[in-house]
């Protein structure tokens, strides 16, 4: 299916995004990362065999002070992604939405069968992908993506892909920029992948309002099905933390006072508990 070029759904401008993301970079770690070298390493090829593009996710929002004890707990059961001696990687994500912020509102209103569209750039390898995440009515996350040239993206390919997956032609615009640094672990015994995201920073596309979250980190447990034994989940729950429906896109929009086409602030009632939790975690020492 080909998209009418007179009405492109999504115009990608990686160079512009990169300039904005570079201003968001934060590297002021207050934690010791030397523990990462104590994990058994795995390669990107090995990790791709457990890509879990169709999966069940559990997300946990945690204070930075439990990062080191958590990692110590995971040493026995998990390996760590290692690329040329590097174990922590820089991500730049640009999110797109309709002018009315329909993707945001679908999530806010608890709608299933909902989408998120983003351009993700892996800074350390200079690889880019257009990605579409779909949360179905069984609460499974299905992610599809295509590689994208970060210098001269193929606009026709982008629009064909997005149109085919979304099933409509409403134009999308840049909504939010997100930076973070990621560690990826694989369970040695079960089909489970864990991502640990640190040093999150956000900027709204229209208002250029920034929010930096350096005192928290996000753990996401990704499995084919539930429940597999997970020492990661057990440790987190043992310490009194519960899973939360945390979306970087939605929370980033709420933190940066994102607006719709009429410059009306987006409603965020559904996210107040998470926003309050963020405030609480940011005051812990």
Residue ranges and their predicted role:
Residues 1-285:
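Phosphate-end processing signature that detects enzymes handling 5′-triphosphorylated RNA
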């Amino acid at each position: 299916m080909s998209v009418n070029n007179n009405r492109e759904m999504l115009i990608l401008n990686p160079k512009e995004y990169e300039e904005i993301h570079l201003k968001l970079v934060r590297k002021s770690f207050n934690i010791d990362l030397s523990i990462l070298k104590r994990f058994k390493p795995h390669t990107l090829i090995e990790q791709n065999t457990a890509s879990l593009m169709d999966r069940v996710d559990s997300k946990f929002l945690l204070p930075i002070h439990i990062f080191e004890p958590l990692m110590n707990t995971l040493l026995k059961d998990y390996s760590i992604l290692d690329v040329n001696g590097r174990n922590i990687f820089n991500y730049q994500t640009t999110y797109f939405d309709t002018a009315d912020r329909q993707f945001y509102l679908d999530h806010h209103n608890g709608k299933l069968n909902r989408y998120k569209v983003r351009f993700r750039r892996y800074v350390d390898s200079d690889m880019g992908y257009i990605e579409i995440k779909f949360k179905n009515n069984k609460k499974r996350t299905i992610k599809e993506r295509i590689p994208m040239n970060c210098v001269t993206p193929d606009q026709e390919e982008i629009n064909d892909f997005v149109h085919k997956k979304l099933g409509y032609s409403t134009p999308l615009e840049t909504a939010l920029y997100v930076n973070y640094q990621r560690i990826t672990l694989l369970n040695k015994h079960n089909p489970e992948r864990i991502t640990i995201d640190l040093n999150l920073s956000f900027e709204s596309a229209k208002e250029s309002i920034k929010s930096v979250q350096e005192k928290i980190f996000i753990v996401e447990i990704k499995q084919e099905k539930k429940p597999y034994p997970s020492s990661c989940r057990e440790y987190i729950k043992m310490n009194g933390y519960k899973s939360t429906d945390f979306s970087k896109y939605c929370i980033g929009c709420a933190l940066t006072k994102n607006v719709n086409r009429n410059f009306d602030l987006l409603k965020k009632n559904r996210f107040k508990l998470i926003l309050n939790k963020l405030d609480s975690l940011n005051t812990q020492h």
